[in-house]
């Protein structure tokens, strides 16, 4: 079964779609959390497994956990659920992989960080500051013709924030990609 994230009537052309009963279904967005031993080559093997099966990794985030010698890898991608389930089973068999989770829907809480350098002069600073306040962004550097702003949130919040700042001129941008944890008392 293919889950839809967007439906479009037949007659419109879209890339990477699956046709089913006169509608196009976009592949579902997946957030995969992988707990691993922090060893040489683990990340390369995991990324290779995804790319070898035709998945394009949209975001990739790696960092140590609170346990010594362990790291969490968070991967976001779009893809067919059946093919991804097979890939996850193969991931789970890799030697240094401790556990793999595919967060579907509201099972996980995800956030990303963005640093954005925006063109700002004396006439636009107040408006940019108001946008920052609405999105709970933080101005972390002020220069004569620019501001560097930090913001965190889910992917949709970050997109909306960047859309508003785009009219001022974004000169540089760095995003972390999603990091995610499972909701509730169960841990990965």
Where are the model-predicted features located?
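Initiator methionine at the very start of the polypeptide chain
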Residues: 1, 27-28
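Short, Lys/Arg-enriched N-terminal segments with co-localized hydrophobic residues
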Residues: 13-27
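Long, contiguous binding/interaction regions
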Residues: 28-72, 76-188
């Amino acid at each position: 079964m293919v889950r839809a994230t967007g439906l479009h009537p037949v007659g419109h052309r879209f890339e990477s779609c699956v046709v089913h009963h006169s509608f196009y279904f976009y592949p579902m967005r997946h957030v995969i959390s992988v707990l691993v031993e922090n060893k040489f080559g683990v990340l390369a093997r995991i990324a290779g497994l995804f790319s070898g099966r035709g998945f394009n990794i949209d975001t990739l985030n790696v960092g140590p956990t609170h346990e010594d010698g362990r790291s969490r890898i968070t991967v976001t991608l779009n893809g067919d659920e059946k093919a991804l389930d097979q890939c996850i089973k193969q991931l789970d068999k890799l030697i240094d992989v401790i556990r793999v989770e595919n967060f579907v829907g509201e099972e996980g809480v995800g956030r990303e960080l963005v640093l954005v350098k925006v063109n700002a002069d004396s006439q636009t600073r107040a408006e940019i500051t108001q946008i920052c306040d609405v999105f709970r962004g933080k101005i972390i550097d002020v220069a004569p013709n620019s501001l560097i702003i930090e913001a965190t949130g889910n992917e949709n919040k970050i997109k909306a924030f960047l859309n508003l700042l785009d009219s001022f001129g974004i000169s540089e941008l760095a995003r972390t990609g999603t990091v995610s944890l499972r909701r509730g008392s169960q841990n990965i």
